[in-house]
Amino acid sequence: MPKNSKVVKRELDDEVIESVKDLLSNEDSADDAFKKSELIVDVPEEKDTDVVERSEVKDARPAWNSKLQYILAQVGFSVGLGNVWRFPYLCQKNGGGAYLLPYLILLLVIGIPLFFLELSVGQRIRRGSIGVWNYISPQLGGIGFASCVVCFFVALYYNVIIGWSLFYFSQSFQQPLPWDQCPLVKNASHTFVEPECEKSSATTYYWYREALNISTSISESGGLNWKMTICLLAAWVVVCLAMIKGIQSSGKIMYFSSLFPYVVLICFLIRALLLNGSVDGIRHMFTPELEIMLEPKVWREAAAQVFFALGLGFGGVIAFSSYNKRDNNCHFDAVLVSFINFFTSILATLVVFAVLGFKANVINEKCIAENSEMIIKLVKMGNISQDIIPHHINFSAITAEDYDLIYDIIQKVKEEEFPALHLNACQIEDELNKAVQGTGLAFIAFTEAMTHFPASPFWSVMFFLMLVNLGLGSMFGTIEGIITPVVDTFKVRKEILTVICCLLAFCIGLIFVQRSGNYFVTMFDDYSATLPLLIVVILENIAVSFVYGIDKFMEDLKDMLGFTPNRYYYYMWKYISPLMLLSLLIASIVNMGLSPPGYNAWMEDKASEKFLSYPTWGMVICISLMVLAILPIPVVFIIRRCNLIDDSSGNLASVTYKRGRVLKEPVNLEGDDASLIHGKISSEMSSPNFGKNIYRKQSGSPTLDTAPNGRYGIGYLMADMPDMPESDL
C-alpha cells in the first residue's frame, strides 16, 4: 500500500482496515472519525489466510491433552471444600430435602447460564479474564483485574485450609488417633485430665490447642505456629510445582485430584451405611420442612451457594476454557459440570449425615448410660421411688425406647423437682440438630465420628487426603485465574510469575499461621470475596448482554458451536439473571449490615467459643479488602473514559486485530502495510508495542454496530475468529 494513499469512502462490502485506537476510544470525536474513515485495501483473500495459518503454526496456545482432562479440571475447580462442609449445613438448616428445590431452581436460573457465559467468552476470545473483558469493552477491562485480586485474596487463606488438612493427614498414621482421648497432665502429686479438654471434648481440644494453639482474640497474635507454618509452606510448594509447567502438568494431576475425592466419598458412604444410626441421620437430613422453603433467607442462601459452588467470577473458569478448541461444545460442558457439582453436593450430604447419624447414635447411647446410672443413684438415695420404674426395664441393657419411657414418667411424677434432677432427654434428633459447618464439621465433628470407626486411622487418612485433593483442585483453578490473564496481557514468563506469585502469597499468608490466624481466615472468608464477586459477575452479565449485545453474542455462539443455543439463555442473560444477581447483591449488603462484624473467639478458661467484635483496625482491614477487590473496576473505567493513558504507549486498551484475531503490533504502520498485506510479518512485530492498530473488515459484514469497541461490540471479529495463539495475545 503506498505511503501517500488517501482515506476515502467506500461501500460497506469493500475490504477495509481500521485503526483500533480510533475504535477503542469512547470520545465522540473518535467515534465520528471512525464513522467517516475507511481505508481501501485490495488484498487477495488467500494471502491473508496464509498469514493466519503460518502464524498459528509458529505460535500455538497451550491446549488440553484431552477433553476428559479439561472436564476434570473444571470439576476440580468447581467442586471444592464447600461441597463437603457448606452444602450439607445449608441443607439441614433450611428445611432438609425442601432446600434442594430452591437450590435446583436457582442452579438453572443463575448457575448454568452464567457458567455457560464464562465458558463461552473464554473459549471464544481465548484469553484470561483481563484480556477477555478488555476485548469486549475496554472501559470494563477492570473486571478482569478485579477477578485477579479476588483470586489472590482467596488463594491466601484457602491454601491455609489445605495446610490444616495436611497437618491432620500427617497425624492420622497413629493408633489410636491423637484426638481420640483427652491428654493427661502429671504433676508431683497426681495425674488428671487436661481441664480445657475435660470441659469441651477431645477433638475440640485437639483442634484449638494442639493444631492451632489459638489465642483468645484477634488482637493477641501470639507469634507463629511453627507446625502450621511448615504445612502452609508444603501446600504452596505443591501448588507451585503443579502450576509451574502450565495446564499440561496441572491437567495430569487433575486425573487424581478430581477423581480421588469421589472414591473416598463412595467408600465413606458404603462404610457409614453399615454403621448403627446412619439411616437416622439420612432420614433426618431429607425430612422436608416445606414451610421453611417459603422464607426469603432460604432462597438468598441457596443463590449464594449456587454462585460460589461453580466458581463464578474468579476467572478460573475463563482461564481453563481459553485453552479449548474454538469449536468445543462449551454448552454441554456447562451443563455437565454444573450437574456433576450438584450431585457431588448430594453425595457429600449423604456421607456427612450418615456419619453424623452414627456419631449421634454413639453419643446418645453414652447419654442413656450416664443418665441411667444417675437414675439408679436417685432411686438408691430415695429421691425417686422404685415403684414408678416399670418392672420390665433392665438398667444393665436399657434401650432408647425404655429410657424415653422412664424419662417421661419421672418428668410427670416429679414435675416441680424435675429440673433439679439434671436428667437429659437423650434424643438423637437433638444431636442431629446441632448444625455444624466449615472447620467445625471437618476438624471436630467428623474427626470425632471417625474415632468410633473400626480401623479409624485408615479412614482418617482417606478423609484428610480427600480434603487436600478437593482443596488443590480449587487452588489450581484459582491460581490459573491469576496466572493466565497476567501472562496473556503482560507477556511475562509463566514459570517466573508462578514462583513469584506463590512466594508472595506464602509470605503474606504467614498472618494466617499465627496463633490468631484462624480469626484472620474468618475475616478474609467473610469480606474478601462475597460482595466483590457478586459485583464482578453482575458486570460480566451486563458487558455481554448490553454493552456487547446479546443478539451478537447469540450469533457468535451459533458460529462457534454450530447450532443456536436455546432461546432460554437469551432471556436468562438479558433479563432474569441480572435481576436475580442484583437482588442477591442487595440482600447480601442488607444481611451484612444487619449482622455485627465479628468472629467466634476460643476462650481457653471456659473451653468454649465467644463472639467478639472486630477492633477498629480489624474493621479497616475488612473494608479495605472489599474496596481493594473492586477498585480496579472504577479505576480502569475512569482511565479509559477520560483517555488518561496514551494508547500509543503500550497499554491494555490498545490491541491489534485482523480478521477477528489478534496480531502483533507493527512498529511502523505505513512501513509495514505492504508486508502485512502480502502475507508477511516483519520481525519487528514480535514486540507487543501497542500503538496504531489496524482492522480488516470482511465483506458483507455490518458497519458501525460491529466495530470492536465497547459501544459497537465485536460481532464481526468473533464471527470468524480462528484459534488465537498465546504469543499473539
From Swiss-Prot:
Residues 1-69, 643-729 are cytoplasmic. SUPFAM superfamilies: SNF-like. Residues 163-225, 357-452 are extracellular. The chain crosses the membrane at residues 70-90, 98-117, 142-162, 226-244, 253-270, 306-323, 335-356, 453-472, 496-514, 530-550, 571-592, 620-642. Belongs to the sodium:neurotransmitter symporter (SNF) (TC 2.A.22) family. SLC6A15 subfamily. Its main location: membrane. This is Sodium-dependent neutral amino acid transporter B(0)AT2. It holds the Pfam family SNF. The modification Phosphoserine is found at S25, S55, S687, S699, S701. It is a multi-pass membrane protein. The lineage of its organism: Eukaryota, Metazoa, Chordata, Craniata, Vertebrata. The gene is SLC6A15. It comes from Bos taurus.
